[in-house]
Amino acid sequence: MIALPRNRRPLFLAVFAYCAALLAFGLYLQHYQGIEPCPMCIMQRYAFALVGVIALVAGLHGPRGAGVRVYGGLLLLTALAGGSVAARQTWMQLYPPEIPECGPGLEYMLESFPLTSALPMIFRGAGDCSAIDWTFLGLSLANWSLLNFGAAALLALWLLFGRRVR
C-alpha cells in the first residue's frame, strides 16, 4: 500500500480544487450549454460542494493523527451520500420508467414539503432525471459523478486506513 505523505495539506487542497472545478463545469453546462440540472443533479452538486468544503477546512487546518481520520470519515460519509444519489440516477438512466413524469423542481419541493416528504420525492426522480443530455467517452454526467464520488471515497478510505510515514 502506498504510504500517506507526512504533510496532507496539499492533498486536501487538491481535493478542494478538484471539487471546485467539477462545480464550475456543472455551472458551465447549465449557463452556457443550456443543460438544466434535475433535482438529483442539484443534490450531487451539494455533495461535491460539501466534499470540497470539508477538504478546504482540512487543508487550512493541516490535521495530524486522529484529525486526519476525522476529516477522512467526514469525506467518506459525504462521498457515499453523493455516490448513492449518482448511483440512483445512473440506475434511472439505464432503466427509465415507461412514461417519465416531470416532477416539480428541487427548490419547490423543499419549500412546499417537509424534508421527510421531499427526500422520497427527490429519489423517485423526475422525468428529467432519467434523461441523458450530455456524454463524454460514452458516460453520462451521472456516471461521471459516480466515478468521482467513488474516487473521493477511496481517497477517504486511504486517509482512514493508510500507513503513515514516520
Curated annotation (Swiss-Prot):
Membrane topology reported for the UniProt record: Multi-pass membrane protein
Compartments where located: Cell inner membrane
One annotated Gene Ontology cellular component of this protein: plasma membrane
Claim: Membrane is one of the keywords in the record: yes
Keywords annotated in UniProt: Cell inner membrane, Cell membrane, Chaperone, Disulfide bond, Electron transport, Membrane, Oxidoreductase, Redox-active center, Transmembrane, Transmembrane helix, Transport
Biological-process GO terms, alphabetical: protein folding
Chief site of localization: membrane
Transmembrane stretches, start-end: 12-28, 47-63, 71-87, 144-162
Any one GO MF annotation of this record: electron transfer activity
Topological domains, Periplasmic: 29-46, 88-143
Cysteines joined through disulfide linkages: 38-41, 102-129
InterPro entries: DiS_bond_form_DsbB/BdbC, Disulphide_bond_form_DsbB, DsbB, DsbB-like_sf
Gene3D superfamilies linked: DsbB-like
Pfam family, one: DsbB
Record keyword Cell inner membrane present: yes
Stretches of the chain found on the membrane's Cytoplasmic side: 1-11, 64-70, 163-166
Role this protein plays: Required for disulfide bond formation in some periplasmic proteins. Acts by oxidizing the DsbA protein.
Name of the featured protein: Disulfide bond formation protein B
